[in-house]
Amino acid sequence: MRSKVEILPSTLIFHELIGLEIKVSNSTNPSLIGIRGRVINETKNMLVVENSESRELKIPKADSEFVFRIPAELSEKGRRSDIFVKIQGNLLLSQPENRIKNIKKLRKWG
């Protein structure tokens, strides 16, 4: 049985984002503010979010701010409530697979 990977607020930017719920809390493009949904894909510069109407929306990471919901079952052991984490999109600007590799380096050396 595979062990569950914990997602902590301090390491969220290194984790897989697909499947997490998200809200755009700020953006240089005012029409993006308030968009909510689930991340269904990610590229170096974009998050693809499926909203409640099953529409796929492409949101640039640069110049946007996101609030991610980390479900209690994926967060710290013993936590009973979800965690909401605000992240500047510029911190996510890299290919997802490279960003995920960086957490392995942190764990190895940290």
UniProtKB/Swiss-Prot annotation:
GO terms for biological process: tRNA 5'-leader removal. GO terms for cellular component: cytoplasm; ribonuclease P complex. It holds the Pfam family RNase_P-MRP_p29. Gene3D superfamilies: Ribonuclease P/MRP, subunit p29 (2.30.30.210). The keyword Kinase does not apply. This is Ribonuclease P protein component 1. Consists of a catalytic RNA component and at least 4-5 protein subunits. It is found in: Cytoplasm. Its main location: cytoplasm. Part of ribonuclease P, a protein complex that generates mature tRNA molecules by cleaving their 5'-ends. The keyword Cytoplasm applies. InterPro entries: RNase_P/MRP_Rpp29_sf, RNP1, Rof/RNase_P-like, Rpp29/RNP1. Its EC number is 3.1.26.5. The gene is rnp1. Belongs to the eukaryotic/archaeal RNase P protein component 1 family. GO terms for molecular function: ribonuclease P activity; RNA binding. SMART domains: POP4 (SM00538). It catalyses: Endonucleolytic cleavage of RNA, removing 5'-extranucleotides from tRNA precursor. Keywords: Cytoplasm, Endonuclease, Hydrolase, Nuclease, tRNA processing. It comes from Methanosarcina mazei (strain ATCC BAA-159 / DSM 3647 / Goe1 / Go1 / JCM 11833 / OCM 88) (Methanosarcina frisia).
